[in-house]
Curated annotation (Swiss-Prot):
<protein>
    <recommendedName>
        <fullName>Putative COX1/OXI3 intron 1 protein</fullName>
    </recommendedName>
</protein>
<dbReference type="InterPro" id="IPR024937">
    <property type="entry name" value="Domain_X"/>
</dbReference>
<dbReference type="Pfam" id="PF00078">
    <property type="entry name" value="RVT_1"/>
</dbReference>
<dbReference type="GO" id="GO:0003964">
    <property type="term" value="F:RNA-directed DNA polymerase activity"/>
</dbReference>
<dbReference type="GO" id="GO:0005739">
    <property type="term" value="C:mitochondrion"/>
</dbReference>
<dbReference type="GO" id="GO:0006315">
    <property type="term" value="P:homing of group II introns"/>
</dbReference>
<dbReference type="Pfam" id="PF01348">
    <property type="entry name" value="Intron_maturas2"/>
</dbReference>
<dbReference type="InterPro" id="IPR003615">
    <property type="entry name" value="HNH_nuc"/>
</dbReference>
<dbReference type="GO" id="GO:0006278">
    <property type="term" value="P:RNA-templated DNA biosynthetic process"/>
</dbReference>
<feature type="region of interest" description="Disordered">
    <location>
        <begin position="162"/>
        <end position="188"/>
    </location>
</feature>
<dbReference type="GO" id="GO:0006397">
    <property type="term" value="P:mRNA processing"/>
</dbReference>
<feature type="compositionally biased region" description="Polar residues">
    <location>
        <begin position="167"/>
        <end position="181"/>
    </location>
</feature>
<dbReference type="InterPro" id="IPR036927">
    <property type="entry name" value="Cyt_c_oxase-like_su1_sf"/>
</dbReference>
<dbReference type="InterPro" id="IPR043502">
    <property type="entry name" value="DNA/RNA_pol_sf"/>
</dbReference>
<dbReference type="InterPro" id="IPR000477">
    <property type="entry name" value="RT_dom"/>
</dbReference>
<feature type="domain" description="Reverse transcriptase">
    <location>
        <begin position="296"/>
        <end position="577"/>
    </location>
</feature>
<keyword id="KW-0496">Mitochondrion</keyword>
Amino acid sequence: MVQRWLYSTNAKDIAVLYFMLAIFSGMAGTAMSLIIRLELAAPGSQYLHGNSQLFNGAPTSAYISLMRTALVLWIINRYLKHMTNSVGANFTGTMACHKTPMISVGGVKCYMVRLTNFLQVFIRITISSYHLDMVKQVWLFYVEVIRLWFIVLDSTGSVKKMKDTNNTKGNTKSEGSTERGNSGVDRGMVVPNTQMKMRFLNQVRYYSVNNNLKMGKDTNIELSKDTSTSDLLEFEKLVMDNMNEENMNNNLLSIMKNVDMLMLAYNRIKSKPGNMTPGTTLETLDGMNMMYLNKLSNELGTGKFKFKPMRMVNIPKPKGGMRPLSVGNPRDKIVQEVMRMILDTIFDKKMSTHSHGFRKNMSCQTAIWEVRNMFGGSNWFIEVDLKKCFDTISHDLIIKELKRYISDKGFIDLVYKLLRAGYIDEKGTYHKPMLGLPQGSLISPILCNIVMTLVDNWLEDYINLYNKGKVKKQHPTYKKLSRMIAKAKMFSTRLKLHKERAKGPTFIYNDPNFKRMKYVRYADDILIGVLGSKNDCKMIKRDLNNFLNSLGLTMNEEKTLITCATETPARFLGYNISITPLKRMPTVTKTIRGKTIRSRNTTRPIINAPIRDIINKLATNGYCKHNKNGRMGVPTRVGRWTYEEPRTIINNYKALGRGILNYYKLATNYKRLRERIYYVLYYSCVLTLASKYRLKTMSKTIKKFGYNLNIIENDKLIANFPRNTFDNIKKIENHGMFMYMSEAKVTDPFEYIDSIKYMLPTAKANFNKPCSICNSTIDVEMHHVKQLHRGMLKATKDYITGRMITMNRKQIPLCKQCHIKTHKNKFKNMGPGM
């Protein structure tokens, strides 16, 4: 029975074993508790004496607790051989124990990998011990245990086929099913039964760190000769090392050339429509295969990889002028994505909490929310705008900042190659820039953030110097009336004085001895809130301009504005931000130092959506118009959509409305904006449908489709535009709603590692699937489409495209021959029987 419990991977057997252990632990704990209670009742007389008393020997130091934890873990690692993720187990972390060392996946040694996610717990203990400045030997021992755990947990399984020679049912296939829900690769684990016969178990993760595994005589294991992938061990180590912000990073190029990292990067960018747009060559992500990734890995390892020049196009700015945009080679973006992941891992924790642009779990909304929470009480705003920030950043400054934390010359050279790759303009002329970041590169935003972190550090130091005073000084009139109230004996006199005092200010509005400064940055847009005088704002603007000039950046004097917070709203990230005037602030009764006073309560900033500007933007794009009599936002038809299906027309309008309202759901005037947006988009949709069906009037259209614009197909409602379409987009009222509904969530490094590892099996499976048409496994590559339109399903005659729309897949594996035939429309008008 004991052997059954120890060797079984059945959930019930393991549950019984754990239940017995729990009972034993409870009995032992009860006995120890009884002894301690007896000692406490009559100390120093019965069981243990003096300093040897049991309750005195309990560990009271964090150091002793950590050392004992290490001792227990060492004993487990030394004497307990086990496997993880058992078949039929209730949850990940249930382990089956084994005595024979030959079955250990580590070969010679077997280490504890996971027990109720204990790896994360132990790493956190390690970090705690680091901050507690533990003994050096204990710290080194912890690091070694962590390293050995990583080897077992994270190394790629190099086993391709495992077969039980005693199995009479035939060979066990290693190819995985390609059905949805399966990662595409069936993993296996060697688990012995009581007779020590090896079995192959499907869908159990197998970790291998050594090709020279010690196995039983009857075990037949074919090892893969491909050792080019090492899973994500090095990247995970990079994540853990950079929890220390002063860490110097090396061997980054070895992470870059890892095929698994390249595969993961491809998987992250493959569905973006822009990656089907060619750059200066005709190559896109269409036709991607493992051969190209292996070639890319070799070029990165040997230093032969070069970024191709980008294609430069000019797009108009909303307020006039043209913005240059670089269109890069889609296949170069695979390398850029790996670089972005590495740079993000190294530098994100070093950036300011006031920086919200192009960062994980940061967005425009988190920046606006910080303004809402932190800028109350400001009486001046400084809207800082940098002139062509991306185009004027010095390459030498970028490299200098990278070298502060990166010592890998190969990686630095790769960044330098990207910066100097150049571009080809619309006339076909090649340019090699000496300044600036290519707008369109995946790593340009984070490189900009790295440089702008210098500005963040300067502003934070400046704030510490500028802020002064603890509390505002009370207004003389307020103090005078307070003394009169204290001396007044008649109730009517007191009431009269109270009313007179409430009309005036409580504190000196511009107290020279009380100053405050706040700031928020999103990329190159900075908003500074100042509690002080206008001269202070001019001084801040001048000093900031001087510092920007020292970095080679230029402040746009025309767009950098100093505005009175209570009179003129500041425009930041599309919101109008203002402060409630002092006279309109609500009054509240407070007790300060035993005295009851009535003061005006400072309110949060008013964050309004610029409804007039939004309507003007809709008018520019043809959704509404302005009448000659001055009426704004009169809905009109959208002629370019009259050729679409009615379902597509309605869904386009709803998507536009959701996009606007989701962005402005922090606005104080959100409900008014929602009603206005619904009015314009709904009646514009009605007029567009009227134009499509030549119904001439809105009343005839509503009579045909109903007030909710119900589109029915085969007695099934497929689209509508009801009155409550946008009611599910709620205005964010408080911080709890914001944390729940927005992107402002703290990223745990362990969760980040797990999320990346979760994506890797799926990415690998895509390249291991056979051709979706002929089921061939030779020369399989990925067929890409730029967009999938559900409305095209009936109109398309291409069976392959129709199936991709039905499956909602932008990529499918095809062999070389079928891929060529697909692009030549050879499968047109064919059906499932092809």
